[in-house]
Amino acid sequence: TDVYTRRTESQSDWLLSRLAMYWKSHATEVYVKGEVFDHAGGEKAPAPTVRYTGTRGTAATHGRPKLEDIVPYDDNEDGNVTFCNNALEGRPLESVHPSKTGRNIENLNCEILGIARDAAFLYWMTGEEKYAKLAAGVFDTYMTGIYYRKVPVDLNHGHQQTLVGLTSFEVIHEDALHIVVPLYDFLYNYLKSNYPDKMIIYAGALKKWADNIIANGVPHNNWDLLQARYVMNVGLVLEDNKEYTDGKGREYYIDYVMNRSSIRQWSLTRLADYGFDINTGIWAECPGYSSVVINDYANFVNQFDTNLQYDLVKAMPILSKAVATTPEYLFPNRMICGFGDTHPG
């Protein structure tokens, strides 16, 4: 972190200028065709907006350069990015359409946001303003860019429209949001003192993110819990409902996670009633999806207890049975069977 802090001290925009943004076009609309990025456009926002990633999958002909090799403020009239051609010796930099880059655009932004988050943590720990300046520059640029960006439109008018996030093709892979939330939390007092007029923008960006995760996704399986985790984390760093003109603050989003259901986002209680067998505690998906679900519920138990002093196990007694049933997935050699996305680790 200190390496980038020193660079930022000598050139204030060194790190933030390497974010993947629509620096020149300020595009507000993003258009995809199924699982592939097509183009960006729409009205010009008052500030640079966040670039959308290339594809739903990870396959890419062009990879992102090292951070120091990223072209600052990289944006041309064709909407291309300057990335490395993986097929050529030396991986030379080329201007390439984002659809050739897999998920590297969002990953680049996550790397930069991660550096900013670590700097925010160091500021919170030490009080040294140099860390706050680095973190705030990146955070302000990125979150303002999220605030003015709209949810992507699928030109194929297909199922993908119900899955897209603001930065990723799946709402369950809005990885940047997992980084932004603690960044905001650690940096909150500094932002409130130095960016007071932007606090409503930051909250608006977080709420837009959460609202889209609620609106999209899959409600009746493991996706729902992954979505709920994002929404819960946003709720915990917002102010009370009364602080926002739309009445949507901390209580609103936490209540949505616990008690409310919509077409693509079920409450924790409704999902548990639907997914766990009342007699055995077995989850209605194959392993390892089932083990992931139990782990996520256990994390929610801890989160509710730590932050809200609320006993989720008392509210959902089936969780005790589900945890106790977990060893039943093991073979005698302590291995488990797995289907789908199950990973050996």
Spans of model-derived segments:
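Extracellular polysaccharide-recognition and catalytic grooves
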Residues: 200-345
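Extracellular glycan-targeting catalytic surfaces
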Residues: 1-236, 298
